[in-house]
């Protein structure tokens, strides 16, 4: 018998229907798909042993987080905190000015910024560190210092942490002449009796241009390299001793501002503080390729929504001349 190909068509259709449904009722079987798990956010600071304690301090903008340190840093028992802010969203501000005392809590009462730390150095109610606000000089880094105030005079540029017009941050050294012209130097200037910095010395000098800046020193990390410039900056702040410290840094890769404080002077049993080298190493480990030290010792303080993180080593908050706020 001659076979016609169309003779098999009904059988093939029936077989196909049966293969789609074991009962042959014409319903297509629905397969269950696994719902992919949402990606887990990796917190680089938690991975390094820090603890996210933001919720302990109340409501906070989503672009600011607060962390407490692991029990040990640099092989020392420590109590430290960092506030980390998205630099593309947060506002960096300098509080205070050339003179006048304020505790950090008084700054908070006036400003209510989520994060406040102490700022630069001061003496007798006057700032010794640069304050630069809205693109203008408020007060300079101290222009001259001396070990004897008679025969030896050091005109030393000191460290500055600055926000630039493009929104990035950088550390460097500044010096202001008697005409209030401020110069920016990429390297520090070696101490030399009577030698003044100017528009061409040290090398790479240029007019200082920034939106906002706070002075302090010494510079701890620049260009992702740890810097030892406290001698060139003539900062006699016990750099190799364990003390309370305050610093501010910038991670240019992730666009993060990192504000650091550590407790010291035995306010908590067994907690002496950290050296400048310790702080530099910690900040670099946290990803900061630019970091400047600020005033430390009894001045060191960080407020989160007005609440203290470390215990000030004076027993209570020291009155300071300026501070830094993140909003």
Labelled PLM ranges:
Residues 1-8:
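Bacterial N-terminal signal peptides that target proteins for export
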Residues 16-19:
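C-terminal motif of bacterial Sec signal peptides marking the signal peptidase cleavage site
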Residues 22-178:
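Zymogen propeptides
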Residues 77-82, 158, 215-217, 243-247, ...:
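Short glycine-rich loop/turn motifs
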Residues 83-84, 114-118, 160-162, 170-172, ...:
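Structural recognition of the beta-strand scaffold that forms the well-ordered cores
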Residues 103-106, 180-186, 239, 268-274:
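A short, polar/proline- and glycine-enriched secondary-structure boundary/capping micro-motif
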Residues 126-151, 229-290, 299-327:
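Conserved, well-ordered active-site substructure
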Residues 126-231, 237-239:
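Active-site-adjacent helix-turn-beta-strand microarchitecture at beta-sheet edges
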